[in-house]
UniProtKB/Swiss-Prot annotation:
Disulfide bridge positions per record: none
Cross-referenced InterPro entries: Aldolase_TIM (IPR013785), GMP_reductase (IPR050139), GuaC_type_2 (IPR005994), IMP_DH/GMP_Rdtase_CS (IPR015875), IMP_DH_GMPRt (IPR001093)
Tree of life domain: Bacteria
Organism: Lysinibacillus sphaericus (strain C3-41)
Gene Ontology cellular component terms for the protein in this record: cytosol; GMP reductase complex
Catalytic reaction list: IMP + NH4(+) + NADP(+) = GMP + NADPH + 2 H(+)
Gene Ontology terms, MF aspect: GMP reductase activity
Job description of the protein: Catalyzes the irreversible NADPH-dependent deamination of GMP to IMP. It functions in the conversion of nucleobase, nucleoside and nucleotide derivatives of G to A nucleotides, and in maintaining the intracellular balance of A and G nucleotides.
Name of the molecule in the record: GMP reductase
Binding positions for NADP(+) per the UniProt entry: 204-227
Keyword terms, alphabetized: NADP, Oxidoreductase
Catalytic site positions: C175
Catalytic activity, EC: 1.7.1.7
GO biological process: purine nucleotide metabolic process
Length: 327
């Protein structure tokens, strides 16, 4: 793998604009038979999403994935979402008790629309077994499996029955896998996405390394159907993290799923904690993301998201910000 690149090394090249206004551009995307306003999903992390925010996102036409760090609350969550006429989208791990949980859902006919198998190194026999188990007991649930970073992994998980794969090993802002283990897609996440997307026959979710709204468009260009974002969604009014004051500024905590803050112990730690500036309402961020993506579509010369997939690009090593600090 020579010649890899990441988000900041790429510029997309404009094509002739065919709209009068960017508001004519449609940012919606369909996944698992459901249509969502944006190809974006907040990360299924404890400081990014909780039940209240999940409900709010679903009510407003956005995709969400509930985290798996309160496993005992999942049955009630599915019932609650379905009771409100909303989709249920949950996460599971691969431990023994998760097998029983899936069987329990099947036995009580509680069928979540989306189930994400969420582990750090998704190219594993454990994940393949879990995909097969879910598909056997809940064949109508859309299964997202991850995380992976290679075409072989994408092929194997798709062949096992995954309906989508999640790509990204350690590129996230609060992920330190790359430092602790020497492995991952940190620093070349966009190239890894492209490499995986070429092998994929089903949707890919790009996960990690997004630092600007332009990175969403770049992810779509290189094959993502959906883009998972953590740090840009952290620190909002609705974010579950604690709000505290540091030097007179309001900040919120944001930590990785494999951090000691998540686990409650220092064992196999591959995540860290940081404080992010309080950003106001998540609604404003979602609207801004949509407007920026509408602009991206207009620069791509189309009216729909797919237009972005066909544009040319250049690799400009570490120069696109011209010294500007954007994050």
């Amino acid at each position: 793998m020579d010649n890899v690149f990441d988000y900041e090394d790429i510029q997309l090249i404009p094509a002739k604009c065919i709209v009068e206004s960017r508001s004519e551009c449609d940012t919606s995307v369909t996944l698992g038979g459901h249509t969502f306003k944006l190809p974006v999903v907040p990360a299924n992390m404890q400081t990014i999403i909780d039940e209240t925010l999940a409900k709010k996102l679903a009510e407003n036409g956005y995709f969400y994935i509930m985290h798996r760090f309160q496993p005992e609350a999942r049955v009630n969550f599915i019932q609650d979402m379905h009771g409100s006429g909303l989709i249920a989208s949950i996460s599971v791990g691969v431990k023994e008790e998760e097998y029983a949980f899936i069987e329990e859902l099947a036995a009580t006919n509680l069928v979540p629309e989306f189930i994400t198998i969420d582990i750090a190194h998704g190219h594993s026999n454990a994940v393949i077994r879990m995909i097969q188990h879910i598909k056997k007991h809940l064949p109508n649930s859309f299964v997202i499996a991850g995380n992976v970073g290679t075409p072989e992994a994408v092929r194997e998980l798709e062949n096992a029955g995954a309906d989508a794969t999640k790509v990204g090993i350690g590129p996230g802002k609060v992920c330190i896998t790359k430092i602790k283990t020497g492995f991952g897609t940190g620093g070349w996440q966009l190239a890894a996405l492209r490499w995986c997307a070429k092998a994929a026959t089903k949707p890919i979710i790009a996960d990690g390394g997004i630092r600007t709204h332009g990175d969403i468009a770049k992810s779509v260009r290189f094959g993502a159907s959906m883009v998972m974002i953590g740090s840009l969604f952290a620190g909002h009014e609705e974010s579950p993290g604690q709000t505290i004051e540091v030097e007179g500024k309001k900040v919120k905590e944001y930590f990785g799923s494999a951090s000691e803050f998540q686990k409650g112990e220092r064992k196999n730690v591959e995540g860290k904690k940081m404080f992010v500036e309080h950003k106001g309402s998540i609604k404003d961020t979602l609207i801004e993301m949509q407007q920026d993506l509408q602009s991206s579509i207009s620069y791509a010369g189309g009216t729909k998201l797919d237009a972005i997939r066909n544009v040319d690009y250049v690799i400009v090593k570490n120069s696109i910000f011209n010294g500007d600090k954007v994050y």
